[in-house]
């Protein structure tokens, strides 16, 4: 989604006038960009344009030589609200304690507690209030003053905590303070994300809140043809949201450059490193002027992310909401059933029957492989359930369609792999079902975090088999921390009680009358389709070959 030329400009002198002309008489600044010769002496940044369509290896500029040639830019826009200024240190400490907020660094601005205290110009504030938000989230209360002050920062918060707006809104203010884009300029704000789904989600927020400023944005990701993305980049966009691999492709063929980037965001940095993007991230960041503002966001704080921050952030300040210890939201009810593989389908049906009692239910089912995703989806659809699958072998158009069907509730059951589900933010997911357990406890917490978001409650069901015994102790620890009921069958895998006996799998759950009555999975649900007739014949929705 792109917009026309931006006609609002911000400067420091009229910041508190709210809603005035934000151009601020910066014509000389704009001309300094328009009159500047295009091109330069390094590829991907100011690089030369020979062999424009042929990939050219990105070369790190000599910033000691290049930086003095670049125009200066504004990045500190924060004006502390008088209500914030008048709060005592003890009040601030109490607020941070109540919000489980930990800070580090020096000269950290005080947190705000309302949208008005954030000091956003009217064109931003009006967009926020139009969305009907009651108050800022914890990470926004501290993150906005940090980001608006122009400091490099690290934000550590769980998915669904409001972190996207924590960097998106200050980014919009940052853009409106800079000279307008000239033909051939790249973005002012660059957001790197691990997956196309998260990138599209970020673009939606940027479009929504940048609309009044006519700020254009482009989303650049793999899995689709480059042609449309190239056209969008050529028209000029103040914000580019990108996955690392596709952005490097665009830089190497000269379809964009990073010479105007002064606000860099690394979103879900831990996931990007988990997915092996560190070399690409480093290659990209090396192309950006070192006096930029950099914001790094992560759900966890492992040593690899710490090292990346140490290498690329300058004297950063840090805010963390919640514990650094891996934990699950206490809004989620965790149910673990110790089963054998052949019991999983019957258990799945049981929980879907429970979930479907809610007319607006959404259930996300995780499987370990693409093939298993398709197998589960095929089985469920044959059994009358409105299920669709999403995984890496499906093209982007089909993935987008599946996500849309899931979001609007026409297909309230989605089966996904971990990779396909990363970055997906769908409101109203009531149930997460781990048909196959993930390979590590971090992915378990990430999976079940798809429900119970933004203060809502949710339920996570996991089918634990003997093959998952390596996860047992850590899973029990996560459940204990969240005060969950731990089934006796699972305690076999607890280091604190290892070696103890355990009841037979599934004993005492009952209610199914035994597996024999099903007459085999193919025909045991003969009357089920009649119960789904209200769905308009889900088997004939025109996507029967999905």
UniProtKB/Swiss-Prot annotation:
GO cellular component, one term: cytoplasm
Enzyme class (EC, first level): hydrolase
Amino acid composition bias (Gly residues), ranges on this chain: 498-540
Annotated catalysed reactions: ATP + H2O = ADP + phosphate + H(+)
PROSITE patterns to which the protein is assigned, alphabetical: DEAD_ATP_HELICASE, HELICASE_ATP_BIND_1, HELICASE_CTER, Q_MOTIF
Protein residues bound to ATP: 157-164
Gene Ontology MF term list: ATP binding; ATP hydrolysis activity; RNA binding; RNA helicase activity
Cross-linked sites for Glycyl lysine isopeptide (Lys-Gly) (interchain with G-Cter in ubiquitin): 474
Main subcellular location: cytoplasm
UniProt-listed SUPFAM superfamilies: P-loop containing nucleoside triphosphate hydrolases (SSF52540)
UniProt GO BP: nuclear-transcribed mRNA catabolic process, nonsense-mediated decay; rRNA processing
Protein name in UniProt: ATP-dependent RNA helicase DBP2
